[in-house]
Amino acid sequence: MTTLLAYVGAALAEIAGCFAVWAWLRLGRSPLWLGPGLASLALFAVLLTRVESGAAGRAYAAYGGVYIAASLVWLWGVEGQRPDRWDLGGAALCLAGTAVILLGPRG
């Protein structure tokens, strides 16, 4: 599994899992949302172990930018709220940081 695919899958799983808890506590949905939510959060954790990195902290730091970008896609696609220029600019900065972490030479 490629690192990018693992990061994107992890982001979707984490956001879906957290949204299930949000739906239960904030939107008044059934507690039955928690089962799939917990499964999604477990999948998120497993997927992060699949990235190509010798250090967990570096893998998590690089993942942060992908998570932010995926959260804005969720905001638009699932919640129907279009990200504004500040959202997009912030995500671009975070993705630049992700690229530095992932692509920087290691010696």
Swiss-Prot record:
Keywords: Cell inner membrane, Cell membrane, Membrane, Transmembrane, Transmembrane helix
Presence of keyword Transcription regulation: no
Cystines in this chain: none
A Pfam family assignment: UPF0060
Record field: transmembrane: 4-24, 31-51, 59-79, 85-105
Membrane topology value: Multi-pass membrane protein
Domain of life: Bacteria
Name under which the protein is recorded: UPF0060 membrane protein Mnod_6500
Organism from which the protein derives: Methylobacterium nodulans (strain LMG 21967 / CNCM I-2342 / ORS 2060)
